[in-house]
Amino acid sequence: DPLTDDALTGGYRVWQRKRGHRYSIDDVLTAHEACLALPGASHYIDLGCGLGSVLLMVAYKLPATRALGVEAQEVSYALAERNVARNGQAQRIALRHGDLRGLRAGSARDEVLAAVGAPGGADLLSGTPPYMPVGTSTPSPDAQRAHARVELRGGIEDYLATMGALLGVGGRAVVCGDARTPERAAAGAAAAGLTPLRRLDAIPREGAQALFSVWTLGRTLDLPPETVCATDRFVARDADGQRTSAYRALRSFFDLDPRPPHDIT
């Protein structure tokens, strides 16, 4: 199964399956929003970390944080192990092979929080759930790609439920979801005891509909009842199809050449 060797940040590279699931703009925007949400984070967990893209991007920008990635899919977990090790981060970034839905209570919850040195709760969480409910699309015959696209182990509601159980006082959770169904994120957040603070809508080209939204949330108990969710938009290409200044700034944030050699979208 051939792998490609790709730049992730100015200092980190990742191996990805050439014909498997690959990191894309939703991962980059989620990592960017997570870094902005709590730049001083010390205890960070990425749920459903896949091959380690968001996990490593955030760790790169927040070099003082202890981090943990959780991944259930075997092929992705193996790649995450290799990618963490190849970038010299195995001492700072731990990995857990398992289903994120099992981390909401008991010894499993205690173990993941202990792994980042935060028994009372992590201060930063991220996740990039699949967007397609079971039955709404035909899963890829490739298991890695199928789990990345179809909610075979749950959707945004499940990610939010686990985030609510792991987030510490004053912490922030960042998760992306289908822009066509914002009500799912809102309902999942409420059920998990979380309140949306910011929603970034990702638009592929000026004039097009948003493809996905990246939500930043805090614990409802920590926030005033009148808290209002701020909204913003990220446009990747202008009306002429050219990369926008926002897109170039996103690459520069991770110390990459703002003129990409090829698209990651």
Where are these regions (language model features)?
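Residue-level signal for inorganic ion chemistry
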Residues: 30, 128, 159, 217
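Hydrophobic/basic alpha-helical segments enriched in Actinobacteria
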Residues: 23, 122, 136, 205-206, ...
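Conserved Class I SAM-dependent methyltransferase catalytic core
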Residues: 153-210
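General small-molecule cofactor/ligand-binding pocket signal
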Residues: 15, 94-96, 197-200
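Mobile active-site "lid"/loop adjacent to the S-adenosyl-L-methionine
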Residues: 129-158
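Class I SAM-dependent transferase core
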Residues: 1-38
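Conserved SAM/SAH cofactor-binding pocket of Class I
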Residues: 32-117, 121-127, 133-141
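SAM/dcSAM-binding transferase cores
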Residues: 209-265
